[in-house]
Amino acid sequence: MRVTAKVDYAVRAAMVLARAAEDDSGPIKGERIGAEQHIPVKYLENILSELRQSGIVRSQRGAEGGYWLARPPETVAIADIIRAVEGPLATVRGERAEQLDYGEDAGALQEMWIAVRASLRSVLERVTLADVVSARLPRQVQKLVDDPASWE
C-alpha cells in the first residue's frame, strides 16, 4: 500500500482535532493545523472540506470559527479518514477488486487482491483516532508492530 501525502495529512489533521477534543479547546483554525503539522494550508482546507462532507469533521466560519471532530475520536477509524479523502482502501487500476475480470487463467489474482484489501481493513478499521493519539494501538495491531518482520 502506498500512503499518499493526502492521506497522511488527513490523518495528522484529524489527530490535531482529536487532541483538541480531549482538551475541549473548541474549534481549531486550519492555519494552526497547517502550521503545527507542516501542511500547506490551501491543500489542508480541501482535505478538511472532504472530511466535513464525510461527516468526520464539522466547521464554523468567522473569527471564532474553525474545525472540530463531528464524532468522538474513539469512533473514527483510520479507514474512515482514508475513504473520505481517497475512496476505497484498495483498488486495482482504480477498480474495486470484486469488479475485475481476469478470466480463468488469472482468477486467483483477483482473490489475492480481495485478500489484500481484507488485510488492510483488518488494521485500518480497527485503529481509531483515539488509539493513535494515545499511542496505544489495539493488541492485534501492536503484535504486528512488535514483529521484526513487519519492519523489513
Predicted regions and their residues:
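A short alpha-helical element within helix-turn-helix/winged-helix DNA-binding domains
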Residues: P27-H38
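C-terminal regulatory/oligomerization modules of transcriptional regulators
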Residues: E98-E152
